[in-house]
Regions:
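Catalytic cores of histone-lysine modification enzymes
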Residues: 492-609
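Intrinsically disordered, low-complexity acidic/polar tracts
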Residues: 359-362, 367-465
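Compact mixed alphabeta submodule
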Residues: 325-382, 626
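Short, Lys/Arg- and Gly-enriched loop/turn segments at beta-strand edges
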Residues: 323-330, 532-538, 640-652
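Conserved SET/PR-domain catalytic core that frames the SAM/AdoMet-binding pocket
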Residues: 335-346, 505-538, 621-640
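C-terminal interaction modules of eukaryotic adaptor/scaffold proteins
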Residues: 620, 628-666
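Acidic, glycine-rich low-complexity segments with interspersed aromatic residues
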Residues: 89-95, 127-129, 133-135, 139-159, ...
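Extended, intrinsically disordered, low-complexity regulatory segments of metazoan chromatin-modifying
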Residues: 1-133
Length: 666
């Protein structure tokens, strides 16, 4: 041991004197080793037993916050035993490499010994590490998370953590695709790298483990990666479908289930929107060729069994097929459930499997039920209540845009001509040697011979799935003047709608826009189509780049990736001349996006050449992950006198209902 004890010494447990040795002549109660729970120092970082990709240290996501307390008396050294790594689907470990549980009194406990091949470090050494980690909770350019917010978050903190994680992931994807990462940072899993950076910086929330709802996470929220759920405390396991902790009362300790993920790996019945038949974890998951072995009542299965007796609330996350990317899944938080019953039945491999019947608690907002309804509307198996038009675009869009009013008797918005292009656009000149690139087939990320990539400061603005990496002063896309193919990935804003949109009547803000599909942060939504005008005489159906807009940060923080800040593109837009677009007579779905002071959509100026001239376009992208049937909104901005002061006249009263509402817009 590092403390320098002699071979036959035993640490004393009291605060007493001198030698601190135990009197060996005293009779003590002896228990079998297997009945003893390991005693671990609070500040010790535990290592994970799961195997991770080469080049990645284990993740340590949840840890006990440092408390201001007097130095405790010497503790007995923790007992450690080796356990072989568990199978990926069996493992109850989270990104912290352990269950890191707490009892009902809020004390951190653990349910199993951890493997160790190195001598244990002293508490003093571990304490130094914690202090360093806590100093890094505030990240330059991103904002800080207090120690209290690390334990218990809120909506704003949860959004900040998710946006910071996703901005890092997008940047790492961009670097990976352009082959600019060195061998140390290079990885095919940018999400793991981003998660590791966030963990090392202590940038996370809801670390305090709890039964029931998680502060700042709302029913219906969507996640595109399990790591996202880990970093906001919704589900602490990056691989396992069952998350649990050890609860302690006066008589005993027992595992209690916190959350489950039903993602189709096991043979789960998920057809009913309020009932879920969940299969336990173990040997027999949906594989006919596996040797018949009964599942064991241990770890997550035992936690579910105990929770069925305790009748505690369990968070349920449903993994569903992404309607846009068929090979991916979207995770939707479906709220709180209780286990009504459990039983054992024969699985497909012939072994016994545990089954648990989860029943959703009443009075919660609909989540999975919304997905089920959308599925029926898309297949035509159920009629849409309040449907006025099946396709408002009359075939202009490749995906139909429905028009719905289930609020009142209004039959539709005022007449206009649907168009998905910009009319009467005014060209402007740039100091460029050419109006297009000479790439064969499609432009390739990292190819600095491509003139369009050069105009984007050497970065390909989008990653492979069409997600925008960063806000830029201008995004230079390939256009009709370029020699690359029309399906070039640098033409994202010219490819039309990718999600099925619906124009609907709101309760108090006229007509609005929403999507049948979940939308990932950075996804292109639509262009603002209409007529370019010199001056806006009216305030309705007008987009104006000269307005004053609230600043916000969306890009990754370069210091997290050890990049030089001076080489990073600013988020301030650079527009050669003001662009004003009216969609009153001609327009597309963008005209129906309402204003919000806390929007979920932002606009980005995009430039490409047509007919030997450059034209400016306004493209809209998702600011964060947007659940299906959520209204899409952006900041309309405020008018300006010309001397820098905002003009109150002509403004409209804001009804966005946001906690950050500024009262008016336009």
């Amino acid at each position: 041991m590092e403390e320098g004890l002699c071979e036959n010494s035993v640490p004393g447990s009291g605060s007493g004197s001198g030698s601190g040795l135990v009197d060996r002549t005293r009779i003590v109660e002896v228990k079998p080793l297997r009945s003893l729970a390991p005693v671990l120092p609070k500040s010790l970082h535990l290592s994970a037993s799961r195997r991770y990709p080469s080049g990645f240290p284990p993740f340590v996501l949840f840890e006990e916050p440092q408390e201001s307390q007097p130095s405790p008396p010497p503790m007995p050294a923790p007992i450690r035993a080796f356990r072989k790594p568990l199978d990926e689907e069996e493992s109850p470990r989270g990104v912290n490499g352990g269950t890191n549980m707490e009892d009902v009194n809020g004390k951190s406990v653990d349910d199993s010994p951890k493997p160790s091949t190195k001598p244990m470090k002293s508490c003093k050494s571990s304490q130094k590490k914690r202090t360093k980690s806590q100093d890094l909770v505030s990240i330059s350019g991103v904002g800080g998370i207090s120690m209290a917010q690390r334990d218990d978050g809120d909506r704003e903190v949860v959004n900040l953590v998710l946006m910071t994680f996703d901005s890092l992931r997008r940047r790492l994807c961009q670097l990976e695709e352009s082959k600019e990462l060195n061998t140390i940072m290079g990885t095919k899993r940018p999400d793991l790298r981003a998660s590791n950076v966030m963990t090392n910086k202590g940038f996370r929330t809801n670390m305090r483990r709890r039964v029931g709802a998680v502060p700042g996470v709302e029913i219906g929220d969507v996640f595109f990666l399990r790591m996202e759920m880990c970093h906001v405390g919704l589900h602490g396991q990056s691989m396992s479908g069952i998350d649990y902790m050890i609860a302690k009362d006066e008589l005993q300790e027992e595992p209690v289930a916190l959350s489950i993920v039903s993602s189709g790996v096991y043979d789960n019945d998920a057809e009913d929107e309020d009932v879920l038949i969940y299969t336990g974890q173990g040997e027999n998951f949906n594989k006919k060729d596996k040797h018949a072995v009964d599942q064991k009542l241990q770890r997550g299965n035992l936690a579910l069994d105990k929770s069925s007796h305790r009748q505690n609330e369990v968070r349920v996350i449903r993994g569903l097929r992404d309607s846009v990317n068929k090979s991916a899944k979207v995770y939707v938080y479906d709220g709180l459930y209780k286990i009504q019953s459990s039983w054992i039945e024969k699985g497909k491999s012939g072994g016994g499997v545990f089954k648990y019947k989860f029943v959703r608690l009443p009075g919660q907002p609909s989540a999975f039920g919304v997905w089920k309804s959308i599925q029926k509307w898309k297949t035509g198996s159920s009629s849409r209540t309040g449907l006025i038009l099946a396709d408002l675009s009359t075939g202009v869009e490749s995906i139909p845009v429905s028009l719905v009013n289930d609020v009142d008797n209004e039959k539709g918005p005022s007449f206009f001509t649907y168009s998905n292009s910009l009319r009467d656009s005014k060209p402007f000149s740039l100091v460029q040697s050419s109006y297009g690139c000479n790439c064969n087939k499609t432009c390739v990320p990292g190819d600095l011979s491509c003139s369009c990539i050069q105009r984007n400061e050497g970065d390909f603005p989008y990653i492979a799935n069409g997600i925008l990496v960063s806000r830029r002063p201008l995004v230079h896309e390939c256009g009709p003047m370029c020699k690359c193919f029309p399906n070039c990935k640098n033409r994202v804003s010219q490819t039309g709608l990718k999600h099925q949109m619906e124009v609907f009547k709101t309760e108090n803000r006229g007509w609005g826009l929403r999507s049948f599909d979940p939308i990932r942060a950075g996804t292109f939504i639509c262009e603002y189509a209409g007529e370019v005008i010199d001056r806006a005489n009216e305030n309705e159906y007008v987009f104006d780049t000269s307005r004053i807009y609230n600043p916000f940060k969306w890009n990754y923080e370069p210091s997290l990736l050890e990049e030089i800040s001076s080489n990073v593109t600013t988020e301030d837009y650079t527009i050669p001349s003001p662009l004003i677009i009216s969609s009153k007579n001609f327009g597309n779905v963008a005209r129906y996006m309402n204003h919000s002071c806390s929007p979920n959509v932002f606009w980005q100026p995009v430039l490409y050449a047509e007919n030997n001239q450059y034209f400016l376009h306004i493209a809209f992208f998702a600011l964060r992950h947007i659940p299906p049937m959520t209204e899409l909104t952006y900041d309309y901005g405020c008018s300006d006198h010309g001397d820098g002061s905002s003009a109150p006249q002509g403004r409209k009263k804001c009804l966005c209902g946001s906690s950050k509402c500024r009262g008016s817009f336009g």
